[in-house]
């Protein structure tokens, strides 16, 4: 049986599920997963957090732009909050105090709530710390926990409501691109045609890329 889609996404982890949800608002989408269930690998086993000051300014800016989505998700498609206040503490060893100051100078521009707390406050928050090794800690009051399973389940429910198709247990193979316009995907008992393939295969992304 051959089916046609506007987009075929390979990999039903958080990247693939997110892309599937947003694209399904205005397009016909197939989400194809090799395992027997979605979120089988890293996406289903992660303790996720929302960190405003993370990695580099570009990543931080993208993170901040996505915050409203997480905040408003309960009103859009989720019965329960996707994010909850958590707070994050980064321990500053006695040998790294100067580096902590540099870090704060860099990241406070994007996350003004960051603060250097002294050893006594850090020890009160995390009593198991070794006092002789700790100079203090950087406290991030804006760090949030993300309910990964709730997020993915909510995205998938909305994806299904939009008419999206989830195909699990399909070891998809890219066969050819006909006339430079249409990808042909062999998904075992299914044949899928699409002008656009999205590689969301995570750790297997290189394998998918080589098929193209």
Which sequence ranges carry the predicted segments?
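Beta1/beta-strand and adjacent pyrophosphate-binding region of the FAD-binding site
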Residues: 2-15, 30
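Redox-cofactor binding/interface segments in oxidoreductases and associated redox assembly factors
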Residues: 10, 52, 199-200
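Glycine-rich FAD pyrophosphate-binding loop
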Residues: 24-43
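Helix-loop-beta segment of a Rossmann-like dinucleotide-binding subdomain
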Residues: 80-90, 103-104, 110, 116-119, ...
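Dinucleotide-binding Rossmann-like beta1-alpha1 core, especially the glycine-rich loop
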Residues: 47-125
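Conserved Rossmann-like nucleotide-cofactor binding loop
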Residues: 15, 37, 204
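Gly/Ala-rich phosphate-binding loop of Rossmann-like dinucleotide-binding domains
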Residues: 20, 24, 158
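Helical element adjacent to the flavin cofactor pocket in flavoenzyme catalytic cores
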Residues: 138-196, 200-207
């Amino acid at each position: 049986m051959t089916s046609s889609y506007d987009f075929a996404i390979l990999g039903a982890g958080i990247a693939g599920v997110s892309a599937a949800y947003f694209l399904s608002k205005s397009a016909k989408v197939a989400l194809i997963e090799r395992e027997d269930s979605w979120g089988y690998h890293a996406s289903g086993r992660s303790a996720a957090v929302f960190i405003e000051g993370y990695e580099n300014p570009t990543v931080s800016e993208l993170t901040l732009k996505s915050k409203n989505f997480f905040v408003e998700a309960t009103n859009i498609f989720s019965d329960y909050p996707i994010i909850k206040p958590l707070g994050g503490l980064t321990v500053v060893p006695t040998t790294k105090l100067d580096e902590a100051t540099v870090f704060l100078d860099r990241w406070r521009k994007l996350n003004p709530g960051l603060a250097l707390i002294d050893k006594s406050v850090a020890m009160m928050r995390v009593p198991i710390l070794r006092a002789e090794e700790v100079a203090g800690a950087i406290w991030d009051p804006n760090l949030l926990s993300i309910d990964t399973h709730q997020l993915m389940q909510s995205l998938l429910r909305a994806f299904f409501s939009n008419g999206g198709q989830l195909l699990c247990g399909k070891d998809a193979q890219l066969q050819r691109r006909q006339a430079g316009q249409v990808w042909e995907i062999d998904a075992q008992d299914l044949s899928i045609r699409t002008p656009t393939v999205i590689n969301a295969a995570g750790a297997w992304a290189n394998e998918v890329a080589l098929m193209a």
